[in-house]
């Protein structure tokens, strides 16, 4: 615990959109400068700050890390967007939009290039405090501009973060890097096996419309020269509890086996009671249609829940909330949720390398 994130008087509120003031505080803590900031006298030109956020804004203003919405307004209660927080973090990593390293308009694209932004830690449509935490963790494991040292190591070297407190996080980053290296070597051998469990809870206002879980296993044997001759097997069970208003007089509890199989350019689907299907399809189209192409061999650190090392290698459990798009749910649920957004979406994965 390096003290980067603090909750509100109502808890951590990870599903709440962050304000500009909250994001400013997070950035100062990320840099290990909270104690220094609290000693500053407020002289910044922004007149709309209430009090607690003044030290953080002053530090960022003094160090060229944050600007106001105008010459005299910071808009502390305004929502912090993914673009804004990415810009904050890029500046913390030593990149300067003022000096032309990137532009605010392309901050997300540049963040992706340097390994800061990914599909797991960042949501541009619904940016939450959860994303702030995930992106901040990723930033600590991202190389500082012009060096091969990650931000965490720089903060320790600068004395901004206690070396003892940072040790366990540094070890976690090292284990994650080792796992990803091993996973990439495994991918080069063309075979993959992955267990996962997708969970979804759908609400409309305060009414819960649907609960879903789908444990599954994916196995692939890639033909790296001719992808369409690759083999993929996907097996799982879809379990749903549905609000009667959606069931239209039908069952409100559903349990259904689902099995997909691909080989030699043919995609086979066994949807249980919904029928069996067979169609010609390329391997790339299968991956894109199921959003599996987003699951590469590497695991972003913000998704990892645990790493276990044993004599047979390493096992990582991780969560990929943003990977499976609504397209996959539409396919599984037959368009049942047209016009209704999924409130929470989890995919828990266990991978070995």
Label for each model-derived stretch:
Residues 24-26, 86, 312-318:
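Conserved long hydrophobic alpha-helices within structured protein cores
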């Amino acid at each position: 615990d390096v003290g980067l994130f603090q909750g509100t008087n109502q808890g951590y509120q990870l599903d709440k959109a962050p304000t500009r003031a909250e994001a400013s505080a997070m950035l100062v803590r990320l840099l290990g400068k909270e104690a220094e900031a609290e000693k500053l006298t407020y002289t910044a030109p922004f007149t709309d700050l209430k009090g607690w956020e003044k030290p953080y804004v002053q530090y960022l203003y003094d160090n060229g890390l944050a600007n106001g919405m105008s010459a005299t307004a910071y808009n502390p209660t305004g929502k912090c967007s993914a673009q804004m927080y990415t810009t904050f973090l890029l500046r913390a990593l030593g990149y300067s939009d003022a000096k032309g390293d990137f532009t605010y308009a392309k901050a997300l694209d540049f963040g992706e290039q340097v390994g800061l932004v990914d599909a797991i830690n960042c949501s541009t449509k619904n940016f939450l405090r959860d994303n702030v935490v995930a992106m901040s963790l990723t930033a600590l494991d991202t190389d500082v501009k012009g060096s091969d040292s990650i931000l965490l190591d720089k903060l320790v070297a600068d004395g901004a973060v206690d070396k003892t407190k940072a040790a366990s996080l540094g070890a976690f980053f090292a284990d994650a890097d080792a796992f990803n290296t091993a996973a990439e070597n495994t991918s080069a051998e063309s075979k993959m096996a992955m267990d996962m469990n997708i969970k979804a809870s759908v609400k409309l206002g305060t009414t819960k419309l649907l609960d879903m879980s789908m444990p599954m296993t994916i196995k692939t044997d890639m033909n790296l020269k001719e992808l369409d001759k690759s083999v993929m097997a996907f097996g799982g069970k879809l379990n749903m509890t549905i609000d009667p208003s959606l069931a239209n007089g039908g069952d409100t509890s559903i349990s259904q086996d689902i099995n997909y199989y691909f080989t030699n350019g043919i995609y086979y689907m066994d949807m249980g009671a919904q029928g069996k299907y067979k169609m010609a399809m390329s391997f790339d189209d299968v991956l894109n249609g199921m959003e599996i192409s987003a699951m590469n061999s590497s695991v972003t650190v913000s998704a990892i829940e645990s790493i276990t090392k044993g004599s047979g290698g390493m096992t990582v459990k991780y969560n990929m909330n943003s990977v499976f798009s609504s397209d996959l749910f539409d396919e599984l649920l037959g368009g049942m949720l047209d016009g209704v957004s999924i409130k929470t979406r989890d995919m828990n994965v266990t991978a070995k390398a």
